[in-house]
């Protein structure tokens, strides 16, 4: 037995043998040497290239600008504004004569040119490109007419929400973030969406008495499709991080309906339903689609009618200016013949003092008393909106009057870009909440929008200029100096003694007049 046991070969595990026919070969495992431990490399900081130059200075001779800049101690002459704000001016004693030239206005903005060209391609027409501006016409419906209009507003919003729910169900944008191209073709086509929503549309028309016009419901479907398109293009071009289009809130403050031009007849719209309609202006010569808006706070019905402004020639002066927006003065304007200071911040605080006191009181009541009735909450929120609206109306009045004054006196305006978003952010702890509120009330971004629109209307070029190094640079010699909180710029090299904001406005003008400067 012992000999038999000796002759038995031990079993080899399957992992350690390779079968090749009848023979077996043992697999040899060789231990590899561990790799030499190399010292870890420190992460190299990537240097981000910036386009910002080290200096923005350009000599006055190269741009053909005079060295004149007034001293801080000067007497301003007041300009009549017919409003609550102050507008002061100081003229150059050695004023040079200004040349005049003829210019055809209004100038059509490039965005509207693109839209009109696309419309001509789609409709296969050769309509001339025109300058379009909206006209406000207020209407005064009776109580019975108001009831009909309110049902129409509700049905328009309901149809809009139904179409957006239908489009979202097609899953155009997937969870991964990619876009389903096949689904976009179906969704972006208004006719295919109308066919899919036909049953809902017919039920809505039959439910109303008097019945709503089918074209008004179709406009709601078209508006939903166009809004979805714009949101999709913004997502593709990375203007927005997340694709999200939400339905309308049925109890929102502002409600709209879109009415076609064919419905405006006999001084009214939809004459079978509204045979007579009182309005602030006659409802005639309407050849484009109109939007009717209702504001629940003001309880006003307003028609926004697009109008074509005809072209005409105007005598313009060859006079350019630089504008520095700031916190001491709303605007500081510099040109070769004069300097202007528009609306000191103290006047803004005094005019909006009562409104903000009431706003703070209402906010305290809402915070300290959370268990309020729904009616009480609605009243308080309505009061908040009322006082905020008063402040915005005051700013709106100032914006339009100031922009009209500037556009009529200058043919080129270079305005500094003020990044208000970063200033008002919570991360910025340098500025106090009171200063942030002042900046928010002045709303510089809205002013630049209104100024550019008025510039196109009256033939004035508006250039947005980056404010980098405009306050620190001497406009006469180009030396850079850190001012801190001082209001006066005193140059040590050339001896220039001027106001801080006026020096910045002159630098903004010089940067905007550079022939190689491009808007960013």
Swiss-Prot record:
- One Gene Ontology term from the biological process aspect of the record: DNA recombination
Family, similarity comment: In the central section; belongs to the transposase 2 family.
Q: Which region ranges are annotated with the description Disordered?
A: 21-52
Keyword tags: DNA recombination, DNA-binding, Metal-binding, Transposition, Zinc
Q: Where is the composition biased (Basic residues)?
A: 21-47
UniProt GO MF annotations: DNA binding; metal ion binding
Q: Which residues bind Zn(2+)?
A: 474, 477, 491, 494
Alphabetical list of InterPro entries matching this protein: Cas12f1-like_TNB, Recombinase/Transposase-rel, Transposase
Q: Does the keyword Metal-binding apply?
A: yes
Presence of the UniProt keyword Glycoprotein in the record: no
Under what name is this protein listed? TnpB-like protein L79
């Amino acid at each position: 037995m012992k000999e038999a046991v000796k002759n038995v070969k031990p079993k080899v595990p399957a992992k350690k043998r390779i079968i090749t026919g009848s023979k077996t070969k043992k697999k040899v495992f060789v231990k590899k040497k561990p790799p030499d431990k190399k010292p870890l490399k420190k992460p190299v900081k990537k240097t981000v290239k910036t386009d910002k130059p080290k200096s923005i200075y350009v000599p006055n001779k190269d741009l053909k600008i005079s060295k004149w800049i007034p001293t801080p101690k000067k007497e301003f002459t007041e300009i009549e504004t017919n409003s609550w704000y102050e507008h002061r001016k100081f003229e150059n004693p050695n004023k040079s004569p200004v040349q005049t030239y003829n210019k055809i206005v209004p100038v059509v903005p490039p965005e509207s040119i693109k839209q009109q060209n696309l419309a001509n391609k789609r409709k296969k027409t050769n309509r001339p490109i025109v300058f379009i501006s909206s006209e406000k016409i207020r209407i005064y419906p009776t109580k019975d007419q108001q009831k009909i209009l309110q049902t129409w507003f509700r049905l328009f919003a309901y149809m809009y929400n139904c179409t957006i729910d239908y489009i979202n169900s097609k899953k155009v944008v997937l969870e991964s973030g990619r876009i389903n191209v096949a689904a976009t073709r179906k969704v972006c086509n208004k006719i295919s969406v109308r066919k899919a929503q036909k049953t809902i549309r017919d039920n809505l028309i039959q439910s109303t008495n008097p019945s709503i016009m089918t074209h008004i419901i179709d406009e709601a479907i078209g508006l939903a499709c166009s809004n979805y398109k714009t949101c999709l293009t913004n997502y593709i071009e990375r203007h927005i991080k997340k694709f999200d289009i939400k339905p309308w809130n049925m109890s929102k403050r502002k409600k709209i309906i879109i009415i076609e031009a064919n419905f405006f007849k006999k001084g009214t719209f939809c004459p079978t339903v509204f045979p007579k309609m009182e309005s602030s202006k006659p409802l005639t010569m309407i050849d484009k689609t109109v939007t009717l808006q209702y504001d629940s706070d003001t309880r006003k019905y307003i028609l926004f009618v697009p109008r074509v402004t005809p072209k005409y020639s105007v005598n313009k002066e060859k006079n350019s200016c630089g504008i520095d927006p700031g916190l001491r003065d709303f605007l500081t304007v510099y040109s070769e013949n004069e300097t202007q200071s528009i609306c000191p911040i103290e006047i803004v605080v005094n005019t909006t003092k009562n409104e903000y006191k009431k706003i703070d009181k209402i906010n305290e009541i809402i915070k300290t008393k959370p268990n309020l009735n729904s009616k009480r909450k609605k009243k308080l929120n309505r009061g908040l909106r009322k006082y905020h609206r008063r402040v915005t109306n005051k700013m709106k009045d100032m914006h339009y009057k100031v922009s009209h004054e500037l556009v009529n006196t200058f043919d080129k305006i270079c305005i500094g870009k003020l990044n208000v978003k970063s200033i008002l952010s919570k991360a910025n702890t340098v500025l106090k909440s009171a200063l942030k509120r002042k900046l928010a009330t002045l709303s510089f971004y809205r002013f630049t929008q209104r100024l550019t629109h008025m510039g196109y209307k009256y033939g004035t070029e508006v250039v947005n200029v980056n404010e980098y190094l405009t306050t620190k640079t001497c406009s006469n010699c180009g030396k850079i100096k850190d001012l801190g909180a001082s209001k006066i710029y005193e140059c040590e090299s050339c001896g220039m003694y001027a106001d801080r904001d006026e020096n910045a406005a002159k630098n903004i003008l010089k940067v905007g007049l550079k022939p190689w400067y491009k808007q960013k």
